[in-house]
Amino acid sequence: MEKQKSAAYLDESNVRGYLVKPPGGPAPLVVVFMEIWGVNDHMRVVGEKLAGLGFAAFVLDFYDGALFAPPDIQGAAAKFKAVGDEGVMDAFGRAVGFFKARKDVAADRLGVMGFCNGGRLAFLAATRYPHDIGATISFYGGGIDNPKDMLGRTSILGNVPRLQAPLLLCYGAQDTSIGPDEHARVAESLSRANKRYTMSVFPDVGHAFMDKAGPAEARATETGWRMTKNFFTANLVKGHA
């Protein structure tokens, strides 16, 4: 019988989130920073997809189980503001320490990824924990450098010199919330700091294309997951990294 992946919501040692492990031995760990809505069905699917690609995935729940859904952006924004960047980074640090003490995942080969607000948080984590993180993926990371940010988030481009891990940034060309001017500022900061990064802009799609229906979104999602697999394999899997 084919072995199945294991999936469960973890609430232990002040660490909370959705943990999915592929069958077999300890796999490289990817911590997923959720969108502003919480650990919803889409974020759980992301974790399961990563496990299907051979990675252990932990969707970090820094809302302590609270969930929001469109159109309640105000409620979600208020929740995130109450936690803040520091609260999220503290939760991430606890999770890293927790998993490094376990034998069922390979937390010494750690990647991070995030979507929307989570994409910014993945970028931030890579600059706060540069010695722990081996690869970072940010899908349409909003607020990395937006002077008119609706959540009051400050630019994190000043942290770029601390970045050590390879970085993959993915954006939708039709995303009105993250325009080409922001892409350019992010790229310029990374290039000036001599950092290793790849920026990919997907045509014909807007924000949150990895969670939307439509032919263009389907093509972009397929490509996005292929890039995710290749990027994490190249940087986290023994024999490739």
Identify the residue ranges that each predicted region occupies.
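N-terminal cap/leader regions of alpha/beta-hydrolase-fold enzymes
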Residues: 1-241
